[in-house]
């Protein structure tokens, strides 16, 4: 029996009433995963035995009636450390790495008796927008297997969209949760920078990275964010702000709420079908009582250029630790220590990772630091100021999550600039450290279109309020791809 069409609340009710056990739910989820895995390719590792053992332990001590996540399985992106489960970051460099510790976010999952059922495929070290840079495999879009699932959290998104799991964790450095959520027609939240601990997340861009939830519905997304949020002394960038219940405002009306629609978000480069879908979604929010007004974010057009200097510079520094000496892949082709360093990194990293390391090293090098990295930091400040000006008068910002729907597999691999531009609407949110969500807002030629809602720092509850109001009065989130049993 499959339970993938049941909400988390419904599953919790079944578990509390002992209509099913955590073990039965886990086994059913594993059946769903294996039945769809060949078609979608969402996972690098499926931890059958460990997941069933965890479920049996939960059954033995009993389901906690006050903990809605007790006994619920989920997938975790493969750049988030999981003790005893291979964690590869989809790289040859870490093809056999089994961590001896859990990321803080994973510790919080276990503290709520959740079950990590496997590790989701991704772009190597989270560098990519299509999940095609993975060393292990390519993942297919749940709606059309000839399309990409987006990236870098493509496996996490495809697993939810295809009905393999109800929930997953991703990470978002420049759109890596929101863009694949849009491409696969699910809900994906990039929380405020510092909301979720980064301890145990393999660092890419340390000033940009955030772990976040991916789900079928807005409420489930909020429920999972409530679990993983909170201060962590092991992460100096972790916020000390008290974490409440992110579902608190779900169900409240949005009458009178002021929402800004930046003209740049519907300008050049945005596909006509996407543009029309977002305009329709904005009008729907107006019918629900929101006030939608056009604004300008004039420096957002520089976001991609700023991002690829800042993120690549941080990646260049963060990836220095992978040298063939301490852990991970080591070349067999060496005569001296220099050979170990050079050949290990040449053989262990893929082309996209090496491209970004070189770009970052160049940006930080003597004679170029001021012209590139320092200048990028100055423009980043202007992007932040643009958002602050808008949020002085508006509650939220809306727009498309991505400029297009999912593109063909292998279509942009030889055009990195075009691939980078796919994140033009999500990158500024990371540069400013803001929360942003993608929710299903419609379809263009049979492929999902996501609407992005952006708020001031620590406004996740308000974002969920508006997202849930839209979801409750539309049926886009209920439509499913054929692999999940839908008609599309």
From Swiss-Prot:
PROSITE patterns assigned to the protein according to its UniProt record, in alphabetical order: AMIDASES
The organism of origin for this protein: Streptococcus agalactiae serotype V (strain ATCC BAA-611 / 2603 V/R)
Protein name listed in UniProt: Glutamyl-tRNA(Gln) amidotransferase subunit A
InterPro entries: Amidase, Amidase_CS, Amidase_dom, AS_sf, GatA
Listed GO CC annotations: glutamyl-tRNA(Gln) amidotransferase complex
Catalyzed chemical reaction(s): L-glutamyl-tRNA(Gln) + L-glutamine + ATP + H2O = L-glutaminyl-tRNA(Gln) + L-glutamate + ADP + phosphate + H(+)
Lineage: Bacteria, Bacillati, Bacillota, Bacilli, Lactobacillales
Molecular function via GO: ATP binding; glutaminyl-tRNA synthase (glutamine-hydrolyzing) activity
Source domain of life: Bacteria
């Amino acid at each position: 029996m499959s339970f993938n069409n049941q909400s988390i609340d419904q599953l919790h009710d079944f578990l509390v009433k002992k209509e099913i056990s955590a073990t039965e739910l886990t086994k059913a989820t594993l059946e769903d995963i294996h039945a769809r895995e060949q078609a979608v390719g969402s996972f690098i590792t499926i931890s059958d035995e460990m997941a069933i053992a965890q479920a049996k332990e939960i059954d033995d001590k009993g389901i906690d009636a006050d903990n809605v996540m007790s006994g619920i399985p989920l997938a975790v992106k493969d750049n988030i450390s999981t003790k005893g489960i291979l964690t590869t970051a989809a790289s040859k460099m870490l093809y056999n790495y089994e961590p001896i510790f859990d990321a803080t976010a994973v510790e919080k999952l276990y503290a709520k008796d959740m079950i990590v059922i496997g590790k989701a495929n991704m772009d190597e070290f989270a560098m990519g927008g299509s999940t095609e840079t993975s060393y292990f495999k390519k993942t297919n879009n749940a709606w059309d297997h000839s399309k990409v699932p987006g990236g870098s959290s493509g496996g996490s998104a495809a697993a939810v969209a295809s009905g393999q799991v109800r929930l997953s964790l991703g990470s978002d450095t420049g759109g890596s949760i929101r863009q694949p959520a849009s491409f696969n027609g699910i809900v994906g939240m990039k929380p405020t920078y510092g909301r979720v601990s980064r301890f145990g997340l393999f660092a890419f861009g340390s000033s940009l990275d955030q772990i976040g939830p991916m789900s079928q519905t807005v409420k489930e997304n909020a429920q999972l964010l409530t679990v993983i949020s909170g201060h962590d002394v092991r992460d100096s960038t972790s916020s000390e702000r008290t974490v409440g219940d992110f579902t608190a405002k779900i169900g409240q009306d949005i009458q009178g709420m002021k929402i800004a629609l930046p003209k740049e978000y519907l300008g050049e480069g945005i596909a006509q079908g996407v543009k029309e879908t977002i305009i329709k979604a904005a009008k729907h929010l107006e019918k629900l009582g929101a006030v939608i007004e056009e604004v300008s974010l004039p420096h957002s057009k520089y976001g991609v250029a700023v991002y690829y200097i800042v993120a690549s510079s941080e990646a260049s520094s963060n990836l220095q630790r992978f040298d063939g000496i301490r852990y991970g892949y080591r070349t067999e082709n060496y005569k001296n220590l220099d050979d170990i360093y050079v050949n290990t990194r040449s053989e262990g990293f893929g082309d996209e990772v090496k491209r970004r390391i070189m770009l970052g090293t160049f940006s930080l090098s003597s004679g170029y630091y001021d012209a590139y990295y320092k200048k990028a930091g100055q423009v980043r400040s202007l992007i932040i100021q643009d958002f602050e000006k808008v949020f002085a008068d508006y509650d939220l910002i809306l727009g498309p999550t991505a400029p297009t729907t999912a593109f063909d597999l292998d279509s942009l691999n030889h055009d990195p600039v075009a691939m980078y531009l796919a994140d033009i609407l999500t990158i500024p949110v990371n540069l400013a450290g803001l929360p942003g969500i993608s929710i299903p807002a419609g379809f263009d030629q049979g492929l999902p279109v996501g609407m992005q809602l952006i708020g001031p720092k620590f406004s996740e509850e308000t974002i969920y309020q508006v997202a849930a109001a839209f979801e409750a009065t539309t049926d886009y989130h209920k439509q499913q791809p054929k692999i999940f049993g839908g008609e599309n």
